[in-house]
Amino acid sequence: LSDFDGRTSKLSEYTGNGNWTLVMIWSSTCGTCRREAPRIEAFHQRHANAGVEVLGISVDSLEGVMNARRFVRQNRLTFPNLVGDPEDVALLYLDTTGTHLLGTPGFLLFNPRGRLRTFGVGPVDVGRLDRIVGEISLVR
């Protein structure tokens, strides 16, 4: 994984830091990703000051970073985004969840200690995520 300027990064840099972390795995050519991006941005805005972080990971690879940048700009995403090769991101998903990434968007939700709480592929139930981070944040 790397940022859009090519600096290497790791998922572990964004998880286990005392905050909930929602990861959205996306592709600039994915129609469902385009529909989900504004919903995830709204989730990010709602929880920005409540111990919840959002991270995007594009599978457009470094060669497609211009498409990834355009996707972020067009969807007005204010949360950090990384880019990775599709195979590397799929392996990361498999290592993290024990299941294959069957498409995009993919979602991973980590608790404040960095443990995977829930995951899935396809449209996400943002209301469910709101409830999960809301309930547990009270106990933080």
Give the residues covered by each predicted segment:
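Short pre-active-site segment immediately N-terminal to redox-active cysteine/selenocysteine motifs
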Residues: 18-21, 26-29, 61, 103
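Hydrophobic beta-strand anchors of alpha/beta hydrolase catalytic cores
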Residues: 22-23, 54, 107
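Hydrophobic beta-strand positions
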Residues: 1-3, 25, 109
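A short beta-strand-turn-helix
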Residues: 1-21, 46
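Thiol/disulfide oxidoreductase modules built on the thioredoxin-like
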Residues: 75-77, 85-134
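Non-globular targeting/processing and membrane-anchoring segments
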Residues: 1-2, 136-140
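Structural microenvironment flanking redox-active thiols in thiol-disulfide oxidoreductases
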Residues: 34-76, 86-94
